[in-house]
Amino acid sequence: MPVDRIEIELADARSPDLINLVTALDNFLNKVCGVERNHGSPIDRLAHDDTQMFIARIAGQAVGCAGLQVFADGTGEVKRMYVVTEVRTTGIGSRLLTCVVEAALAAKLSVLRLETTEFLPDAQRLYRAKGFVPCPAYGPYVSNPINLYFERWLTK
């Protein structure tokens, strides 16, 4: 699939394309790291006003997604970051994460956090390249800190 015309757009969390991508992400995570480590938000949770979802498309085909959930304390979390296998390593993940960071900056958030797993070293490299550093478990993950957590401070 040629990747010269990548488009990223805001998406309705209940759109069929986003549902398909999130389903593919869940299937991938369950296979790679097990159901017990997949803390992904369900579609209904992503459809709230505090969450923006982005879809990456190539020639109209949905090939990736990522979201930003904004919390009342002025922090945010990267949600449901995924790129289909066939177009990984093409920069789509980087572009999606840039969109999420830009949305967090526009919302004047102080810090942006995310959860990942040791089973996704490529994702970890991307997060580090975008200025994220390891941090302790936070929010809903404190009681079950079995994955890896990263943050990027957006204000000084």
PLM regions with names:
Residues G74, T90, A106-S110:
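Short coil/turn segments at alpha/beta junctions that flank glycine-rich nucleotide-binding fingerprints
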